[in-house]
Amino acid sequence: GSIRMEETNASTTSLYDSRKKKMDEELLASLSLPASVFPEIIYPGESYGYLRKEAYPDGYKGKPVEVLACCSHDTASAVLGTDGFGQFAYLSSGTWSLLGTELKEPLLDEASRNANFTNEIGYGSSVRYLKNTMGMFLINEVRKEFANKGKPIPVSKIKEYVDESEDIDSYLDVDDPCFETPGEMIEKVDRYLERTGQMKPTDEKQYLRLVYQSMALSYRLLIETLEKLVSHRMDSLIIVGGGNQAVVLNQFTANAINRKVVTGPVEATVIGNSLVQFIRHGVFKDVKEAREAVYRSTSSLSYLPLDVDIWNKKYEKFRKVIKR
């Protein structure tokens, strides 16, 4: 077969030079790795060739099937499938979240390194300048534990439960290492609150509010950091992936960041994969036209900021708690 290394995946190895578009020979030498251990780079939209005859089902009489490289890193495909325009930040929201923006060139400065932002490659050698953060893992672990305690929280009831809950002036650093592993999540939350001298929630509804507001405020911190690093303001935040169905988190995020939040496609990764093929075959002339088609053909919701003054005060307290 044709063994190649697709660019968006290669860029996540920390061994790929995103400026020279090849593996970093100096880094490889420092690891005593010959460049020859890595196959030739293939770019999204390029062809691996055609399926061999033995791969077809018996009796197949159709045309030979061409195998194209897509953005094989799922977030790269998801970002391509994001129907955003102008200066926007994206949040690929799943078990974990990735928040960033698109750049034409990598940003390889000390400030980016200290902030732990990475330059990963997207379609057309664009740069996905982003940082990983907590996603739906934390809230799902809390829900799972309440279910084990005989207090299940159906997804359909989450908004109702949060609306019914009392406000809580406590906050979590959702990226604290204590929240990274599964199991006993309620106890981990309680221990964190004890350690930071904060009030614990009184019931499952308040736990939901606590986690969601902490995630939203964490996104604000990331967006503010991103804006400083790239030296421009983000007009909006576009959330793609399964996590964008969390309407409470979407609204809390709009409140926290004081700008519009827009939901993009839930299946952005699949759409991005398809767009590579459409562009390759001339259905769309470029990324701009492809994204316009996504915008026209998928449904989205917009969330406008509410209670901004209240959320600004929450953010001040949040920053004091997490000490960042």
Language-model region placement:
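Short beta-strand-loop/turn "lid" adjacent to the catalytic site in phosphate-handling enzymes
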Residues: 1-17, 40-43, 48-53
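Small/polar loops that bind or transfer phosphate-bearing groups
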Residues: 43, 241, 265
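Active-site core segments that coordinate phosphate-bearing ligands/cofactors
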Residues: 2-3, 15-25, 29-32, 53-236, ...
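Short glycine-enriched loop/turn motifs at secondary-structure junctions
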Residues: 8-10, 35, 124
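A conserved helix-loop-beta module that forms one wall/lid of the active-site cleft
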Residues: 28-46
